[in-house]
Every structure is written in C-alpha cells, then in structure tokens.
C-alpha cells in the first residue's frame, strides 16, 4: 500500500507542490571581479519576480595619521562607556560635510572685489555730515545754534553787529497777486520773525552770541571760556572739532547772558593774539 502511495504518475504536475515557495537566492562571482546576485520575490499580483543585480566592489585606501587611527580604536569611557559603537545623538554633533570647489578664476574675482571695495571707499571718503549753520560735523537739526544764527551764506539773514536788516521787498502779509499761504516768519520780506516762547530771555541770548574765527587747532573750549568770562557771564561755548583727528576746525561760538558783555568782549578780543594766531571776533548773524 505504501509503495502505491509513493509512486507518482508521470502526468502529475511536480510544480504544484512548490507553487508557494520562492527559489533560493544565488550569488555568482564573475571573472572581472564582480558578483551577480539573483533574488526572487512576489509582486502585488502574487506573481514571482526575479531580480538580478551586478555588484562591483572597490577598495579605497586612505592614509591617515597613526595617532588618529589609534584614537579611533579607543573604547568609550566615562558616562558613555555603555553606549553603543558610533556617535550618539545626545553627546555628539556631526557637522555638515562641506565640499570645497576651487575656482580657476579666483585671482580675478579677488581683484574685482578689492577694486569695488576701494572705489566705494574713495567715493565715501569725503562724505561727511556738515551743519549748514555752523559747519560743524553734526546734523543741522542738532546744531546748538540753530535758533541763534542763520545758515552761512543764506540771503535775508540779519546782521546783528551792524544793527540793521535788509529792506523788505514786499508789503508783507499774504503774497501779492497770489492766493498761496505765506508762513508768518516769511511775511514782511522775511525780516519779521515770529514770537519766541519765553520772551526776552531767548531774545537776549540770540543777540549775545559771538562768532570767533581763526582759532588755533590746539584750542580747547575751557580755554575760550576762561578768556571770554572776563567780560561777563558766558552761557554757552561751542568749538567745532574734526571728528577723526579731534582738533579744532578754526571757529567757535561764544554766547553771553547780556548783550553789553558780548559787545565789550567783541571790542576787546577782536585782533587778540591766541596761540600764535590773531582772533577774529564778530557778532553771529541772527536767524531770520
């Protein structure tokens, strides 16, 4: 009975028993050193799929410092003694591998960059902040004498030392023949200024400011204050200085509390010798 069960018919399909089994993977070494690996798998439709891969092995030999190679073979110690091999994310930060690509035109690029920087530097070399009122190295809005004197060279400024103003060109008020608005400080030919807060205090300060020119570059504000305080109380001293060198630029402004003291100082100090230079002292022009 067992012999009959073990005998197979020649018409039996031998593949029926192995339909659900995949063939074993095979690896073959070729003459050129490559390997051919054949693997089997089932796809989404349940069919067998054969995959053949050909692999070439390349050995890379790197020459490193023996001390570096020795340190790489060291075991971990301390708090990381029980950690697995390789870098740990909580104790090691792996930097990005930056690939350096040298350029053949690096000399030309460097020259262009240097030339551009030099041209910009030469262009901005003479660009300095300059006050329109006292020619100091600060903004006009921050000038300490913006309410005391008019900008240098401006037409319509009142000459306080002479004691007279320019003759008005118009009748004043609104512009003749025009319906445009004229600000109060420009009416009556621009010579009639608006009222100042504080009354006579500020007016007295405006009329008691002296402009001192031909000042030595080695002068200091305290020296000027000491010289002019002999004639009365000095409320303010401004000496224009160069921002880079720190030396005086040749002019200064002295403000007195009383105009009579300023007139006395102007008379006595005009032509006075100070540090091998002759001072020129005059009343500052009042802002219109």
From Swiss-Prot:
Localization terms from the record: Cytoplasm
One Pfam family hit: RRM_1
Keyword terms: Cytoplasm, Initiation factor, Protein biosynthesis, RNA-binding
SUPFAM superfamilies: RNA-binding domain, RBD (SSF54928)
A Gene Ontology biological process term: translational termination
Domain of life: Eukaryota
Disordered, as annotated region: 1-35
Keyword check for Protein biosynthesis: yes
Coiled coil: none
Biased composition (Acidic residues): 11-20
Bias kind Polar residues: ranges: 21-35
GO MF term list: RNA binding; translation initiation factor activity
UniProt GO cellular component terms: eukaryotic 43S preinitiation complex; eukaryotic 48S preinitiation complex; eukaryotic translation initiation factor 3 complex, eIF3e; eukaryotic translation initiation factor 3 complex, eIF3m; multi-eIF complex
Role played: RNA-binding component of the eukaryotic translation initiation factor 3 (eIF-3) complex, which is involved in protein synthesis of a specialized repertoire of mRNAs and, together with other initiation factors, stimulates binding of mRNA and methionyl-tRNAi to the 40S ribosome. The eIF-3 complex specifically targets and initiates translation of a subset of mRNAs involved in cell proliferation. This subunit can bind 18S rRNA.
Entry-linked PANTHER family: EUKARYOTIC TRANSLATION INITIATION FACTOR 3 SUBUNIT G
Subunit structure and binding partners: Component of the eukaryotic translation initiation factor 3 (eIF-3) complex.
Family of this protein: Belongs to the eIF-3 subunit G family.
Protein name stated in the entry: Eukaryotic translation initiation factor 3 subunit G
Organism name: Botryotinia fuckeliana (strain B05.10) (Noble rot fungus)
